[in-house]
Amino acid sequence: MRLTIVAVGQKVPDWAQTAYDDYAKRFPPELKVELKAVKTEPRASKTLENLLAAERARIESVITRGTRVVALDERGTAVTTVALAEKLKAWQLSGDDVAIVIGGPDGLDPAFKQSAHERLRLSDLTLPHAMVRVLLIEQLYRAWSITINHPYHRE
């Protein structure tokens, strides 16, 4: 299984990149996590609809056909760490590749969210995009650790 995080926005602060890289390197070879950052569409005189459509095209261009798409969305289904571990295990058992998509500052195109296989919410809080990358990779690592009974996660 290949797990890809697709994030709109290419530049994150050094602290966020360092934290992301630290968690990403902890995954085993059979569950490598890849980050694909796509360019944010400039706002200059574009309607929100056109801006989101342009970002959608970029997102879709880096997702391989047949990949299970999970959109992060503030109105998505809330998920606990244990529930995320169950999802991760199911994804691994299915053998499907999975792409988890983080939208840009204006979110994700509504049609893209509708076409996603799942929509998940990480938090009820509004989080900066750099923080979402770190939070997501940490929670994926924690979920993986639960699936193998690794002591990283404690209840």
From Swiss-Prot:
Its EC number is 2.1.1.177. The gene is rlmH. InterPro entries: Alpha/beta_knot_MTases, RlmH-like, tRNA_m1G_MTases_N. Belongs to the RNA methyltransferase RlmH family. Specifically methylates the pseudouridine at position 1915 (m3Psi1915) in 23S rRNA. It catalyses: pseudouridine(1915) in 23S rRNA + S-adenosyl-L-methionine = N(3)-methylpseudouridine(1915) in 23S rRNA + S-adenosyl-L-homocysteine + H(+). The keyword Cell wall biogenesis/degradation does not apply. It is found in: Cytoplasm. It comes from Polaromonas sp. (strain JS666 / ATCC BAA-500). It is an enzyme of class 2 (transferase). This is Ribosomal RNA large subunit methyltransferase H.
